[in-house]
Every structure is written in structure tokens, then in C-alpha cells.
Amino acid sequence: MLISVLKSKISYATVTGKDLFYVGSITIDSEIMKQANIIENEKVQVVNLNNGARLETYVIKGEPNSKTIALNGPAARRCEIGDQLFIISYAQVDPTRENIKPKLVDLKTGD
């Protein structure tokens, strides 16, 4: 049996763009992805702090150091530019494994 645990969390990501007619996904600055240990095409949960919307999608790598956080496709209807997001990924692990440390990136404080 495996359990789902928090793997990575990007806190206070600011939406910088949205493209309703793109096929889907969230575009994230590749440097932020690296800091958070999130890879391209990884499934993530997106939580909008401004309106409470939650959705799941996959990640597209954005330009490094661009600070890009853009929701694409139907997900673009769940946010506005300037909204604050939590972007969360999970891992499936053996429940007997101890000391699982998620990678936390806080864009508000820079940690």
C-alpha cells in the first residue's frame, strides 16, 4: 500500500498570465520549478487564495527567471491576473518510510 504525501509546495505564486484557448496546464518559471523540485508534466493541485478555486493540471516549463505563473486552457477561467496561488504536488510513498521532507518555496518571503 502507498499513501499520498506532500512533495512540494509553492506558496504565494502570483498569476502573471492566462491563455483560455491553450490546450491546458499551468506554466511555471523553470527556476521556481527547480527550487520546488517540480518537473515538467508533473500533476499539481492549484489553490486560488483569492476565490477558493481548486483544480488539478500539469506543469509546463516557463522561461527561467521570468517569474511566469500562467494558467492555460479551461483553468484560466479559475483565476485573474494578480491572484495568489498555492501550487502543490504529492508523491506516493510507502507509509513506513520516515522523515519525508517536502520542498517548500515561499514566493512572498523568497524562502
UniProtKB/Swiss-Prot annotation:
Modified residues annotated as Pyruvic acid (Ser) in this record: S25
GO CC annotations on file: cytosol
The record's free-text note on cofactor binding: Binds 1 pyruvoyl group covalently per subunit.
Posttranslational modification: Is synthesized initially as an inactive proenzyme, which is activated by self-cleavage at a specific serine bond to produce a beta-subunit with a hydroxyl group at its C-terminus and an alpha-subunit with a pyruvoyl group at its N-terminus.
Name the UniProt record assigns to this protein: Aspartate 1-decarboxylase
Pfam families: Asp_decarbox
Record's keyword terms, sorted: Autocatalytic cleavage, Cytoplasm, Decarboxylase, Lyase, Pantothenate biosynthesis, Pyruvate, Schiff base, Zymogen
Signal peptide segment: none
Organism in which the protein naturally occurs: Francisella tularensis subsp. novicida (strain U112)
Family: Belongs to the PanD family.
Active-site residues per Swiss-Prot or TrEMBL entry: S25 (schiff-base intermediate with substrate), Y58 (proton donor)
Any one GO MF annotation of this record: aspartate 1-decarboxylase activity
Subunit structure: Heterooctamer of four alpha and four beta subunits.
Pathways involved: Cofactor biosynthesis; (R)-pantothenate biosynthesis; beta-alanine from L-aspartate: step 1/1
Gene3D superfamilies: 2.40.40.20
Catalytic activity: L-aspartate + H(+) = beta-alanine + CO2
Residue sites binding substrate per the record: T57, G73, P74, A75
Subcellular location: Cytoplasm
